[in-house]
Amino acid sequence: MQHYRLSRRALLARLMTGAAMIGGSANLPARLRAMTAAGIRLTNGPLVLEFDPAMRSRLSIDGLALTAFEPGEALRLVDGRVIDRFIMVDHRDQPTFGPHGPGRRHTLRATADRVEQRLTVTLFDRYPGLALMALAYRNTGAAPLAIAGWHAAMHDLLSHPKGAWSFAGASYPDRRDWIQPVVAGFQQANYMGMNGSDYGGGTPVAVAWRPDAGIAVGHVDTVPRLVSLPVSTQPTGTRLGLSSDQPTTLSPGATLTLPTTMIMVHRGDHFRPLDSYRRVMAERGLAAPEVPQASYAPIWCAWGYERNFTTAQILATLPKAKSLGLEWAVLDDGWQTSEGDWAVDRTKFPRGDADMKAFADAIRAQGMKPRLWFSPLAADPGTALLRDHPDMLLLDRDGAAQNVSWWDSFMLCPAFPPVVEHYKAQIRRIIGDWGFEGLKLDGQHLNGVAPCYNPAHHHARPEESIERLQDFWKALYDQAVAINPQAVIEICPCGDSFAFHNIPAMNNTPASDPTSSWQVRLKGKTFKALMGPSAPFTGDHVELSDRHDDFASTYGIGAIPSTKFTWPRDNDHPLDKRPPGGYVLTPQKEALWGKWIALYRAQMLSQGDYLGGLYDIGFDKPEGHAIAKDGRLHFAFYADHWDGPIELRGLSRGRYTLTDSFTRQPLGTASAAAPNLNAWFDHYLLVEATPLEGTA
């Protein structure tokens, strides 16, 4: 173990600016003088992480500098000062072994005026390019230290002539793309708390990448934290890191411990760092559950009839849905009288519970599986639930309820045990009594909540509501699968960037109200990283896609098809604006829908191995995706129009015969030595590559 130490007396004599410190290092012990002159250089595969004597750091990948030396860690004080220059006084290096396997732990101790910084950097053999950083600050002065905020792992990815792209895991009311080009003036705070009354939470990772390399930063705590992961353009490149604006006062001798930070250098887009993040979090106890086969079944949803459906309309559509190869029938919003009470609407189901059970049985009688829409944690004003249990509400520091805008309702606190028990009882009713085999848990408010100050809840801290939201969802999931181990639990946080910490409580997720086919694809790629390469991701209703029929964007990324067509006619009085022609399944649509669903069922690419590292979704043109399944490679390319060569990546030895997956037309052959295919297409091209026998 290496260990260098500077005495406190020698340190205080040099407690000046970084330049003065370096200039005065001649009187230090020889080994420490070498350390302060050259700093510390840590390596892990392609990653090189360097710290200079002032604790400024630089990131490199395979010898290529991605950042300059800069103060990646800093404290902001209430009086306006920023502490971002420290004197490194101690470095310890020792082997370590834990849930992430073997590695080396480096502990760096540094000091500035009245503050000691302790940074532990751990590098793991199984995660080349990645480091975990644990950072703490101790007040070494005699007076309290008023802190306004901090940042960690903050770096500027140096600019590239072709620019940069970014992934951000925060949620916003405008339902923006999770992946965006970093253009001039780009700035996004990526606050992981609430960015709207009912939009918040997400995946606490930010990624910025150039065509040749990128940087990812996130935290790996197993509960959500109220931090930001800002991404912005800077004169020299793209800045990203982890930060907080939560003020705190540090008493003399007290320590501020920050969330454990992940930093990674990588090639390609955001897929590899998110895949590494998933594996790290699984080793820390946060992983997706086992997936039942039914999670991959294609879906028909009754939402085309909207809330004012009739049961006769739905039941009459089931034979058509079944004939197309669809296996799930989802009863959407409108079966209930209100959010909160969840009483059955007796204008549609006159016998209440008995009719709900009979309805689920009728779906099964048609050879399909019944799934029910449900929106926990929202309660409408005037409901019996809020009349009898006002203590269930999540309240802010002023005693006001959190608004759920979509349903004009109020948020209940997921950390209050009576709320958990209320919804577990609803699950027992839906899955156990009525016999539905799946749940569609829907609403942007599902993703994140605000801190709760309701005095009736006796929270140790207001943030308990945030940290225990994942426990609420897991309690509902466990209740459902205890009744039916094959139950499909879908969480659809409409338009949000999905909250990673909720993943253990679901075994299916959709594109959650995509605004474009591009969103279907970028969300699909992201989920295949966050849940695994065979994650059961649904493309959401195809009617939401470009041209209202873009099954190709679902099929090509290994997603599950879903549709909300009506038949033989639409509702006479729609509540929302419909696309031209409405949702009715015309004979032309029926032929197209049937062909795509049959292709999905024949190939089942959703259960294949999504090869997210082969193509860069930002820089590669045309946009490319690849899936390995049953010895074949399935490629998907997307562009408004393309005329030129396409590279088929990931081919092994030997030759492959190429076929258009949709038309079944031959496209020639290719090999790893000659992987290019000259192609002309509008919107999409799907290519199936089959190894030729005897050419390996």
Regions found by a protein language model. Name each.
Residues 2-4, 10-31:
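N-terminal export signals
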Residues 46, 248-267, 680-688:
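Short Pro-Gly-centered flexible turn/kink motifs
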Residues 51, 254, 258, 473-665, ...:
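Active-site-proximal substrate-binding groove within the catalytic cores of carbohydrate-active enzymes
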Residues 325-537:
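Aromatic- and carboxylate-enriched substrate-binding clefts and catalytic-loop regions
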